[in-house]
Amino acid sequence: MVDAHTHLDACGARDADTVRSLVERAAAAGVTAVVTVADDLESARWVTRAAEWDRRVYAAVALHPTRADALTDAARAELERLVAHPRVVAVGETGIDMYWPGRLDGCAEPHVQREAFAWHIDLAKRTGKPLMIHNRQADRDVLDVLRAEGAPDTVILHCFSSDAAMARTCVDAGWLLSLSGTVSFRTARELREAVPLMPVEQLLVETDAPYLTPHPHRGLANEPYCLPYTVRALAELVNRRPEEVALITTSNARRAYGLGWMRQ
């Protein structure tokens, strides 16, 4: 299995040894690769180093939409340098977050987020790397910017949590939907009803660790080793065997991120 989106630094990793420890725990649960994702410039530097420390780790770099105010000319130049690294496999996470403005001190305003999102879209197109989207309560805004700018060849909706209408739009566009532990939450009714509409060939699985720990460990700290719980919940919703879902989503991740051959 491939954890298509995680945050090893937020899980407590600091150096090569602590990265290896997290990845070894994941490997023992059948997770053979992880994509660790940046949310600011400091973490973009860190995830790139982490991907050099262990061959099972890959990186994605961008500024999180809530931090879009920090996208200065200097930040753009550094992100362009980092995204060219061969171990960086995606531009992300970027997008639009309409939940935090007004709730989180220092959160970028929506118009600033839109401008930063457009820049990251262009970066993904220029580099040929997948675009990894953070969308929180912003379906219409995300679609508006993607349509205005033109989507890259590969688009990944990280931690997809929208309804059936948004799922159909994304599927019809050929985008990938990455599902987290949220699919195991009985309270996530709209998402769980939307999942059967998603072709498994367009699905990825992720932990978004240390957040969104899947059932039955909800409320505890999440790590990449918890990914099989999400795979089992997803398998139940699409009426497939967990082993089959693991195989297909691993193949999807390999293709999307250009990971090459690896064990499922």
Swiss-Prot record:
Glycoprotein found in the keyword field: no
Signal peptide: none
Keyword hit for Metal-binding: yes
Cofactor: how bound: Binds 2 divalent metal cations per subunit.
GO molecular function: DNA nuclease activity; metal ion binding
A Pfam family annotated for this UniProt entry: TatD_DNase
Protein name per UniProt: Uncharacterized metal-dependent hydrolase TatD
Native organism taxonomy: Bacteria, Bacillati, Actinomycetota, Actinomycetes, Mycobacteriales
